[in-house]
From Swiss-Prot:
UniProt binding sites for L-citrulline: Y99, N135, R139, S192, T201, E203, E280
InterPro entries xrefs: Arg_succ_synth_type2_subfam (IPR023437), Arginosuc_syn_C (IPR048268), Arginosuc_syn_N (IPR048267), Arginosuc_synth (IPR001518), Arginosuc_synth_CS (IPR018223), Arginosuc_synth_type_1_subfam (IPR023434), AS_cat/multimer_dom_body (IPR024074), AS_multimer_C_tail (IPR024073)
Subunit structure: Homotetramer.
Catalytic activity line of the entry: L-citrulline + L-aspartate + ATP = 2-(N(omega)-L-arginino)succinate + AMP + diphosphate + H(+)
Keywords of the record: Amino-acid biosynthesis, Arginine biosynthesis, ATP-binding, Cytoplasm, Ligase, Nucleotide-binding
Top-level taxon in the UniProt lineage: Bacteria
Name listed for the protein in its UniProt record: Argininosuccinate synthase
Binding annotation for ATP: A17, F18, S19, G20, G21, L22, D23, T24, S25, A43, G129, T131, D136, D194
Pathway where it operates: Amino-acid biosynthesis; L-arginine biosynthesis; L-arginine from L-ornithine and carbamoyl phosphate: step 2/3
Any one Gene Ontology cellular component term annotated for this protein: cytoplasm
Enzyme Commission number(s): 6.3.4.5
Record: residues binding L-aspartate: T131, N135, D136
A Pfam family annotated for this UniProt entry: Arginosuc_synth
Gene: argG
Species for this entry: Solibacter usitatus (strain Ellin6076)
Length: 453
């Protein structure tokens, strides 16, 4: 089971998930110089902050890659994101504002598709830039081995020799300059950013301090709605679903789900929709903090949840939410393709999402401020005539309700007996600090209690 390499495997092919940034640029040149045969794999995830994907493989070849490939992951990424949406697989929230697990969705796709591409090139050693303190090292480990059980793992940031020689940005920059190489030097920010078509994650550095917040973040998927100098006009948008699939925005149908997501991002981004600030538990149980953007997914989720609430009954919605919380944790932990996740996903997609057909019209204002203006669906079980307060023919009568309330008396009596028992044992009452008070039970209620059995 010793598939984690702590030293560079000289003379062997090593696949590197290559971003084109300073760290992977220095790593790929260093690996070649030390005798390994580096292969470069770059995932096109629709990152909103990447201007030229085609340039990345060219830089990898310049820095010493034996072969450099660009893998278009957008279609699969959108499909997995819609599956998460349909399942409500979002377990992290603060006061009802969700983190939409956009990075875990991206890792599920990257971790499998890049390793599959490596197998095509007979590359069975994989490296990437994840560190030992984060979630990604475990996510990539799991997904990589699912895609290739013969995979071995080499991460430069687990190799002490690499750390000693190139352990910081200053050392990596000096290394590249000393070898006459240019590289993509990102602007030094007060935090780090990772993104894909579904969302952006901002964390680390200054954002590790809870007295720093969203106001230091420059969003990459929309406007900074918290800034007073940013003008945002209200906008009405209509979202259509067919059998759980988002298919139209503002009555424009999209045959390509990728284009629909891009348009949803543009619409939501104009308002700063889907920004959240979360404290969360990493896989290793230590807490971290992130500020997230997900404008398109937030927009689709508003419409999807509205239709769920109007179409399904209370017990189905409750189970959908319970399963979604569990599935969200599994997704976060890198278990999106485990059997327990597949079971929960299939349940939601079959029995919840397939009924979700209809349109929702929303007015977007600033940030996460919105109003739902209209909801239509052929599958709505919301029927106002059943409960209308206006005079007219009713689906049930006052006598029907009297009968229903009479039946309720059975469990009310049982509940009262339990409360009296709790008072008698001291669980309730002034001494327990509980404010619940009950009238004393009448000495003779005139009703004989049935014998206990």
């Amino acid at each position: 089971m010793g598939n984690i390499l702590q030293n560079l495997p000289a003379g062997e092919k090593v696949g590197l998930a290559f971003s084109g940034g300073l760290d992977t640029s220095a790593a790929i040149h260093w690996m070649r110089a030390k005798g390994a045969i580096p292969y470069s794999y770059t995932a096109n995830l629709g990152q909103p902050d990447e201007p030229d994907y085609d340039e990345i493989p060219r830089r990898a070849l310049l820095y010493g890659a034996e072969k450099a490939r660009l893998i278009d992951c957008r279609k699969q990424l959108v499909a997995e994101g819609i599956a998460a949406l349909q399942s409500g697989a979002f377990h992290i929230s603060t006061a009802g504002v969700h983190y939409f697990n956009t990075t875990p969705i991206g890792r599920a796709v990257t971790g499998t598709m890049l390793v599959i591409a490596m197998k095509e090139d007979d590359v069975h050693i994989w490296g990437d830039g994840s560190t030992f303190k984060g979630n990604d090292i475990e996510r990539f480990y799991r997904y990589g081995l699912l895609a290739n059980p013969a995979l071995r793992i080499y991460k430069p940031w687990l190799d002490q020799t690499f750390i000693d020689e190139l352990g910081g940005r200053k050392e990596m920059s000096e290394y590249m300059i000393s070898h006459g190489l240019t590289y993509k030097m990102s602007v030094e920010k007060a935090y780090s950013t990772d993104s894909n078509i579904w969302g952006a994650t901002h964390e680390a550095k200054d954002l590790e301090h809870l007295d720093k917040g969203v106001k230091i973040v420059e969003p990459i998927m929309g406007v900074a709605s918290w800034r007073e100098d940013v003008a945002i006009k209200p906008e009405t948008v209509t979202i259509r679903f067919e059998e759980g699939q988002p298919v139209a925005l503002n009555h424009v149908t999209y045959d390509d789900p990728v284009q629909l997501v891009l348009e949803a991002n543009a619409i939501g981004g104009r308002h700063g929709l889907g920004v959240s600030d979360q404290i969360e538990n990493r896989i290793i149980e230590a807490k971290s903090r992130g500020i997230y953007e997900a404008p398109g997914l937030a927009l689709l989720f508003i419409a999807y949840e509205r239709l769920v609430s109007g179409i399904h009954n209370e017990d189905t919605i409750e189970q959908y939410r319970i399963n979604g919380l569990r599935l969200g944790r599994l997704l976060y932990q890198g278990r999106w393709f485990d059997s327990q996740s597949m079971m929960l996903r299939e349940t939601a997609q079959r029995w919840v999402a397939r009924a979700i057909t209809g349109e929702v019209t929303v007015e977007l204002r600033r940030g996460n401020d919105y109003s739902i203006l209209d909801t239509t669906s052929p599958n709505l079980t919301y029927k106002p005539e059943r409960l209308t307060m206006e005079k007219g023919e009713s689906t049930f009568s006052p006598q029907d309700r009297i009968g229903q309330l009479t039946m309720r008396h059975l469990d009310i009596t049982d509940t009262r007996d339990k409360l009296l028992l709790y008072i008698k044992t001291g669980l309730l009452g002034p001494s327990s600090g509980n404010s619940t008070t009950l009238l004393p039970e009448p000495a003779d209620s005139g009703t004989e209690k049935p014998p206990s059995r």
